Amino acid sequence: MGRLFGTDGVRGVANLELTAELAYKLGQAGAYVLTSETKHTPKILVGMDTRISGDMLEASLVAGLCSVGAEVACLGIAPTPTVAYLTRYYNADAGVVISASHNPYEFNGIKFFNSKGYKLSDALEERIESIILDNSEKIQLPTGEKIGRKIEIESPLDDYVNFIKSTIKGDLKGLKVAIDCANGASYQVAPVTFFELGADVCVINNEPDGVNINKDCGSTHIEQLQKFVIESGADVGLAFDGDADRVLAVDENGNMVDGDQIMAIIGLELKKQGKLTNNTIVATVMSNLGLDIMAKREGINIVKTKVGDRYVLENMLENGHVLGGEQSGHIIFLEHSTTGDGILTGAQLLNVVKSSGKKLSELASIMQVLPQVLMNARVSNQNKEKYLEDEVICEMCKELENEFRDEGRVLIRPSGTEPLVRVMIEGKDRDYIEKRALELVKVIEERLG
């Protein structure tokens, strides 16, 4: 991670870490880096989620963008993937999203997309950082008629809704869909999308007030939707996070269907249609072993990357794979999109439910989700990378792997931001793997603490 940019843009507590001043500087430096070689007046799209700090940060960001001579189209409340798509659709030079995704309302963030709708490379983010922190490049500010201005785009969300509708054949008539908008960026566009696709739509958490985004709702608190699905008699529930780049589903019985299961369902359907390029799904090292077992049975390859949707996307682009994602519900359909898109994913999943004539619970049963235990070992920061060099830790992990064979696994990795080593064990018996995880955590803390 860089000095300003983390794994998903710049993030922090609004007005404390992510200030109006920093937003202005990010707008100015970002616009300069992304548009300095264009021969025309640059056009940049800006969207945001529903946080109270969004207006403040948008005003400062837009001022920075305009100061470099860019025309800025403010989309208002819009999901992150909507901004990515519309940046491509309108042939804009860049897109910017003001959002902290699934984080509490006090936080906010700023992330950029290039003209093709992809998140920026590390090199470009480092260049923006260097301009802001080191004054490494002198930005020549225009004067007179070359100063930028805000421009209007008529009904931008309608263009996104039409895009989602174009990705499936037929409609969703006959399906009752319960949606949890997390009081976030999807609160307008998600209900409209599924209504226009023909579904009977019922919605919760679609009344944002600036401080209730993600609060006990959405994909990080799916219990509310599980209850709502049962009460409303819905066929499927969809829970988005604050910026709607991820989604988790709920079946008709109120059971959660996570990102791994969604990829299993859609991946198998794409394989049947001959559309799963290389018969491969790209997942992360944190994906459930049940996905591997299902894939092996069905003749599908699973490729694993580091945790983070940017690494999933990199692998997909390098190898031509069309489906990838994370257990958390960040799922990428490279045929249609350049980033994780919860609304697109929901539409694809519902399309399989409708076309198959099966209940979501039956479709999800193709993959058995194995119990997964996650624990943290607290160690000194300078030692957290040394677990691979410790013979005792490595030997214990090897013994556990041999014990589980193909019915469990062990994964340990350092935290990127805290003095922790994260321990994950999967297996068929939850009580047993909890016991073994505690033993491993104790050994790691003794050896590296």
Swiss-Prot record:
The GO molecular function terms of this record are: magnesium ion binding; phosphoglucosamine mutase activity; phosphomannomutase activity
Principal EC category: isomerase
The UniProt record gives the binding positions of Mg(2+) as 101, 241, 243, 245
* Active-site residues per Swiss-Prot or TrEMBL entry: 101 (phosphoserine intermediate)
GO terms for biological process?
carbohydrate metabolic process; peptidoglycan biosynthetic process; UDP-N-acetylglucosamine biosynthetic process
Q: Which residues carry this modification: Phosphoserine?
A: 101
Which superkingdom is the protein from?
Bacteria
Cofactor(s) needed = Mg(2+)
Gene3D superfamilies from the UniProt entry: Alpha-D-Glucose-1,6-Bisphosphate, subunit A, domain 3, Alpha-D-phosphohexomutase, C-terminal domain
Q: Which reaction does it catalyse?
A: alpha-D-glucosamine 1-phosphate = D-glucosamine 6-phosphate
Q: What is its EC number?
A: 5.4.2.10
The coiled-coil segments of this chain are none
A GO cellular component annotation here is: cytosol
The known PTMs are summarized as: Activated by phosphorylation.
Sorted keywords for this record are: Isomerase, Magnesium, Metal-binding, Phosphoprotein
**Cofactor comment text:** Binds 1 Mg(2+) ion per subunit.
Cited InterPro entries = A-D-PHexomutase_a/b/a-I (IPR005844), A-D-PHexomutase_a/b/a-I/II/III (IPR016055), A-D-PHexomutase_a/b/a-II (IPR005845), A-D-PHexomutase_a/b/a-III (IPR005846), A-D-PHexomutase_C (IPR005843), A-D-PHexomutase_C_sf (IPR036900), A-D-PHexomutase_CS (IPR016066), Alpha-D-phosphohexomutase_SF (IPR005841)
User: Family, per the entry?
Assistant: Belongs to the phosphohexose mutase family.
Identify the PANTHER family for this entry: PHOSPHOGLUCOMUTASE (ALPHA-D-GLUCOSE-1,6-BISPHOSPHATE-DEPENDENT), PHOSPHOHEXOSE MUTASE
> What is its biological role?
Catalyzes the conversion of glucosamine-6-phosphate to glucosamine-1-phosphate.
Name of the protein: Phosphoglucosamine mutase
The organism of origin for this protein = Acetivibrio thermocellus (strain ATCC 27405 / DSM 1237 / JCM 9322 / NBRC 103400 / NCIMB 10682 / NRRL B-4536 / VPI 7372) (Clostridium thermocellum)
